């Protein structure tokens, strides 16, 4: 009787091949790094990074244009106002007094050359937005004395028994004294004198200086 045969030995499977080690990552170029960075992601994702920048630039440009437009409108309005003022004669405000007028204190004075009666002199002053001179202080009177070579009319006249200035103020006899018995007053080099209003002589206008 033949002996029992042993079953053949099973062949062992070959061991699995070793996996190759992963390759080292390739260094990124600056362009790739920028593309993978936050700004690149924003550009790729369409979140509007570049759009946001251009939007801000557009907004700033619009704001600048609006500001320049407002400045242009303001300058135009100023020119219009200046033109209106100039047409009304306010261009004279550039100097304290009109031409041929003399500045003293806060007043402008006009000393006429031609002789006229008191009322004519008063009317002349009125047409030049002034009045026959009203003297309000001793210093003003002393200033007037310096320009009285031709003894001009001033804005002082008798009303009844008392003298009054043309602006309605009463005359103060304690401040000034008046010689003569006439109705209208003129200035001599050292005093005030009253005489007939129809007498012809130069006159002095006064008004407030431009400020």
Curated annotation (Swiss-Prot):
It is found in: Membrane. Residues 10-28 have a biased composition (Pro residues). GO terms for cellular component: membrane. It is a single-pass membrane protein. Keywords: Disulfide bond, Lectin, Membrane, Phosphoprotein, Transmembrane, Transmembrane helix. Disulfide bonds join 125-205, 184-197. CDD domains: CLECT_NK_receptors_like. GO terms for molecular function: carbohydrate binding. Residues 104-206 form the C-type lectin domain. InterPro entries: C-type_lectin-like, C-type_lectin-like/link_sf, CTDL_fold, NKR-like_CTLD. The chain crosses the membrane at residues 66-86. Residues 1-53 are annotated as: Disordered. Pfam families: Lectin_C. The modification Phosphoserine is found at residue 29. This is C-type lectin domain family 2 member L. It comes from Mus musculus (Mouse). The gene is Clec2l.
């Amino acid at each position: 009787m033949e002996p029992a045969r042993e079953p053949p030995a099973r062949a062992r499977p070959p061991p699995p091949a070793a996996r190759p080690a992963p390759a080292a990552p390739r260094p990124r170029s600056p362009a790739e790094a920028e593309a993978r960075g936050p700004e690149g992601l924003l550009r790729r994702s369409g979140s509007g990074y570049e759009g946001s920048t251009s939007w801000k630039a557009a907004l700033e440009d619009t704001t600048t244009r609006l500001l320049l437009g407002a400045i242009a409108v303001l300058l135009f309005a100023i020119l219009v106002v200046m033109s209106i003022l100039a047409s009304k004669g306010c261009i004279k405000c550039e100097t304290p007094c009109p031409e041929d007028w003399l500045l003293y204190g806060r007043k402008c004075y006009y000393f006429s050359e031609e002789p006229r009666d008191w009322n004519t002199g008063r009317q002349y002053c009125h047409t030049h937005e002034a009045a026959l001179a009203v003297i309000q202080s001793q210093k003003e009177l002393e200033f007037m004395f310096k320009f009285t070579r031709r003894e001009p009319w001033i804005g002082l006249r008798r009303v009844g028994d008392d003298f009054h200035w043309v602006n309605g103020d009463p005359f103060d006899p304690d401040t000034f004294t008046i010689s003569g018995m006439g109705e209208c007053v003129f200035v001599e080099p050292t005093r005030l004198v009253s005489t007939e209003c129809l007498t012809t002589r130069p006159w002095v206008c006064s008004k407030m200086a431009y400020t």
